[in-house]
Curated annotation (Swiss-Prot):
EC number(s) per entry: 4.3.3.7
Taxonomic path: Bacteria, Pseudomonadati, Pseudomonadota, Alphaproteobacteria, Hyphomicrobiales
UniProt pathway annotation: Amino-acid biosynthesis; L-lysine biosynthesis via DAP pathway; (S)-tetrahydrodipicolinate from L-aspartate: step 3/4
Places the protein is found: Cytoplasm
The name this protein goes by in its record: 4-hydroxy-tetrahydrodipicolinate synthase
Main localization of the protein described in the UniProt heading: cytoplasm
Annotated site, Part of a proton relay during catalysis, chain positions: T48, Y111
Length: 296
């Protein structure tokens, strides 16, 4: 992958399966292979949905290695490599590059609330340390800071900054970022429910939670959007809206892990402080899967 590579389509923000207190390698590899077979365009391990805050650094690196190995270059792997410590982010990014990831996803530093200049210097330091594309992960709802379009424009002048995973849920940002950086700046939605509007405004794809359980539908949806076939995309969206909504009925990834357990893909196990989906909401998620045609 060149630094300004194009990333297009449906990218799955992979969950992390656990078993007996550790990682479930077989379930994780099985999920990766199934995703590719179902048409997913790319894979994103150890992000928010992958419970990155509660895996150890060694586990984080192991998950990236397994994902790259199982993908076998059939689709790009955009490895989660974020931290609120610049040194840690650089270490994770270097490891991802070393083991063959196509790119890294680097979240805006959380909790310590850097200024826009601090954000610039953080991403510049990661940029200067590696030679593969970097996708900025802008998620102010979790990190508390919102990277401005002006800061993104400055960063896009660097050789490895390739685009953004936009989890602001502000569709107007797509047009503003497109005007500032042009069509070569990869714009990937981080919000399943608004992805249709995001694509219509000029987006290039989605890093999706829903595609964990509905990879084929999400792939077909993105393919239709990229072709400009919004009539087909809308029909698929109608199937997916209950899932898009109810996979966030409680904190992610509890609902999506429960959904995957219904498909027999893995156990419904999370690490504290995340807990399993409550009994009260399980039938709601199941009915959303029925609506999408994933269960009878």
């Amino acid at each position: 992958m060149t630094a300004k590579s194009k990333f297009r389509g449906s990218f799955t923000a992979l969950v992390t399966p656990f078993k007996n207190g550790g990682l479930d390698e077989a379930a994780f590899r099985g999920l990766v292979s199934w995703q590719i077979a179902e048409g997913t365009h790319g894979l994103v391990p150890v992000g928010t949905t992958g419970e990155s805050p509660t895996v150890t650094h060694d586990e984080h690196k192991q998950l990236v290695e397994w994902c790259v190995d199982e993908a076998k270059a059939r689709v790009p792997v955009i490895a989660g490599a974020g931290s609120n410590s610049t040194a840690e982010a650089i270490g994770l990014a270097k490891h991802a590059e070393k083991v063959g990831a196509a790119a890294v996803l680097v979240v805006t530093p959380y909790y310590n609330k850097p200024t826009q200049e601090g954000l610039y210097q953080h991403f510049k330091a990661v940029n200067d340390a590696i030679g593969i594309p970097i996708i900025i992960y802008n998620i102010p709802g979790r990190s508390v800071v919102d990277m401005s379009t002006d800061t993104m424009k400055r960063l896009f002048e660097l050789k490895n900054i390739s685009g953004v995973k936009d989890a602001t849920a502000n569709i107007a940002r797509v047009s503003a970022q497109r005007a500032a950086m042009g069509e070569d700046f990869n714009q990937l939605s981080g919000e399943d429910i608004t992805a249709l509007g995001y694509m219509a405004h000029g987006g290039h794809g989605c890093i999706s939670v829903t595609s964990n359980v509905a990879p084929r539908l999400c792939s077909e949806f993105q393919t239709a959007c990229l072709k400009g076939d919004y009539a087909t995309a809308l029909k698929i969206q109608d199937k997916l809206v209950p899932l898009h909504t109810n996979l966030f009925i409680e904190a992610n990834p509890a609902p999506v892990k429960y959904a995957l357990s219904l498909l027999g893909k893995m156990s419904n196990t999370l690490r504290l402080p995340m807990v399993e989906l409550s009994e009260a909401n399980r039938e709601i998620v199941r009915q959303s899967m029925v609506h999408a045609g994933l269960l009878n």
